[in-house]
């Protein structure tokens, strides 16, 4: 099936282009199309969408393959599940609140609440906060810790024995990926600061960036062109029409829209210089062999990757082309990634409505951006990648 491709002209003075150009030459749109098709054949992935950002602007948008079992084509405006790329979008919104003086990254969350966190009744929109009634360490948690995955929580309470929420380590003392931590920050913003996170995301992120087909909850107008998914064994899974705003991962989007978000993150559009620096600054070292399981033992210092660290809503790293950041998104039938390099303000964003596409991510990102040193084995563990 012939892939769709959009290309945007990038106009800038020749002197500026020479000054900012990274060493790797970006491949042409037809070359990217061909590489996508090759890797889809290698992985058996049924659908794949990709965007390229250059100089902080959207340069290419591609979509190839199918959006559903009926064989309807995946298009640049097809609704796809963003999964945990939502976390990066949420962090972008939170930093705008910081810029507006509505939130302090280092003020404990207890200062924003009108009662102790465990005194709030259980609510299916959030986590079971009453489970923390015998552990006062929750009072140490700050928004910065939550955005950099240092809350002390597991990924989600429902994964715990008996489904009980608990702190596994003193907040702020190590990295452990936690969707529940992002949900806690959402709770603080809604119950403590008095904001509607869904509305703030719409106003501060989607409307600001022209992301017209992106939402934190399902919209009826998405139904005409949405992507179902394929699991690792090749079975299909229908698109989930999510009805609740979840900072950890409820966002639906398109490759065209998510490209605009990546461009804003890498260029700093919408953020003060100070907040943009915080987004991609190494907040805390990552000390485990892989992202999952989230509470695995830390590696001995000599075996840790020294440049790998938590940013705010993203993971940061250093490689042959300098400083970069990335965020992944995963579900049983979804594989997504966003990789950005500070030098040249370049990104590749990939949305796959087939989880098998993840095996192609290192090759595809390398083809577009060159060698980046993205920590693929930390992100995906022992997954076998195609060359």
Role assignments for model-derived ranges:
Residues 25-81, 102-104, 124-126, 159-168, ...:
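Short, conserved catalytic-motif segment at the N-terminal edge
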């Amino acid at each position: 099936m012939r892939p769709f491709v959009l290309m945007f002209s990038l106009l800038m003075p020749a002197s500026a282009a020479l000054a900012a150009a990274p060493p790797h030459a970006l491949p042409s749109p037809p070359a990217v199309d061909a590489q996508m098709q090759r890797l889809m054949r290698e992985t058996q992935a049924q659908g794949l969408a990709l965007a390229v950002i250059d100089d902080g602007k959207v340069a290419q948008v591609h979509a190839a393959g199918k959006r559903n079992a009926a064989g309807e084509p995946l298009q640049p405006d097809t609704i796809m599940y963003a999964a945990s790329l939502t976390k990066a979008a949420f962090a972008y919104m939170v930093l705008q609140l910081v810029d507006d003086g509505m939130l302090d990254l280092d003020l404990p969350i207890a200062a924003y609440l009108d009662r102790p966190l465990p005194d709030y009744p259980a609510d299916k929109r959030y986590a079971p906060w009453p489970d923390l009634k015998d552990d006062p360490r929750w009072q140490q948690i700050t928004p910065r810790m939550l955005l950099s995955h240092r809350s002390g929580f597991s990924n989600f309470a429902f994964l715990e024995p008996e489904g009980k929420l608990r702190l596994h380590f003193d907040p702020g003392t190590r990295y452990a990926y936690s969707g529940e931590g992002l949900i806690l920050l959402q709770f603080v913003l809604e119950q403590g600061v008095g904001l509607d996170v869904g509305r703030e995301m719409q106003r501060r992120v989607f409307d600001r960036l022209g992301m017209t087909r992106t939402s934190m909850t399902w919209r009826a107008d998405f139904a005409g062109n949405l992507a179902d998914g394929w699991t690792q064994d090749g079975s299909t899974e229908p698109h989930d029409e999510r009805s609740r705003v979840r900072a950890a991962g409820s966002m639906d989007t398109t490759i065209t829209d998510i490209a605009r978000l990546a461009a804003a993150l890498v260029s700093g559009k919408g953020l003060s210089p100070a907040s943009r620096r915080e987004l991609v600054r190494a907040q805390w070292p990552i000390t485990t062999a892989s992202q999952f399981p989230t509470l695995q033992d830390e590696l001995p210092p000599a075996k840790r990757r020294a440049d790998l660290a938590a940013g705010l809503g993203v993971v940061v790293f250093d490689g042959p082309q300098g400083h970069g950041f990335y965020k992944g998104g995963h579900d049983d039938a979804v594989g997504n990634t966003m990789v950005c390099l500070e030098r040249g303000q370049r990104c590749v964003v990939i949305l796959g409505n087939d989880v098998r596409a993840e095996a192609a991510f290192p090759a595809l990102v390398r083809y577009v951006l060159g060698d980046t040193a993205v920590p693929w084995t930390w992100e995906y563990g022992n997954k076998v990648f195609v060359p």
